[in-house]
Amino acid sequence: MPITANTLYRDSFNFLRNQIAAILLLALLTAFITVMLNQTFMPASEQLSILSIPENDITSSGNLSISEIVSQMTPEQQMVLLRVSAVATFSALVGNVLLVGGLLTLIAMVSQGRRVSALQAIGLSLPILPRLLVLMFISTLVIQLGLTFFIVPGVAIAIALSLSPIIVTNERMGIFAAMKASAQLAFANVRLIVPAMMLWIAVKLLLLFLISRFTVLPPTIATIVLSTLSNLASALLLVYLFRLYMLLRPVSLDKQ
């Protein structure tokens, strides 16, 4: 029986509805951790102020690329920018690793008929977090490099590696073996993965657009709320990909 996107969407939404309390709490916890790490390690406002561009320089820098703008910065400005980028990347990486590890553990426990809370899922995921951290760090680095050169290579790499966290968690594979297996399965099932990932990217971009316009709440609270919504979108995508992999797994194991 062929695998259809409608079946996967239905199964994913059913799982999300049945486990909404645990998934919502997991999304909120990881969003809170990400925002708190970001605020804790972010440079002080005095240091950030040196990154501000005078109004008369905005029009002159409008036609410059990002690399050209960075090259025109002073060494002090470049160091502050590097620290800001490193803190943002580190905070997002930690939050994403906890979200992915906790959610994959939650899915596995529920599949075995066990009920676990969000905190229990994170606790039970601790043994797999180091491998997930390395995998997601490498994946993030490679995807960012792809996006730097052109958008299409970055998106293609993201699609290729989309199943790797699930594979490295469920199979006794090394990180690079999981990435290779993910690429093979992903490109063999592009019609099922690409629409889901494009929808996920669209939701992420919409939330990114709303951040600067969400002025009803204090900035920190607004960031946590929007990060939670972003995590929920990622959770739904991960449930979808997990369900897809479980259906593909017997076939993929037979070919190995």
From Swiss-Prot:
Keyword Membrane listed: yes
HAMAP family to which the protein is assigned, alphabetical: UPF0259
Keyword Repeat attributed: no
Topology class, membrane: Multi-pass membrane protein
Top-level taxon of origin: Bacteria
TM region(s), chain numbering: 20-40, 90-110, 118-138, 141-161, 192-212, 221-241
InterPro entries hit by this protein: UPF0259
Name the UniProt record assigns to this protein: UPF0259 membrane protein YPO2199/y2042/YP_1997
GO cellular component: plasma membrane
Compartments where located: Cell inner membrane
Record Pfam families: UPF0259 (PF06790)
Alphabetical UniProt keywords: Cell inner membrane, Cell membrane, Membrane, Transmembrane, Transmembrane helix
Family that this chain belongs to: Belongs to the UPF0259 family.
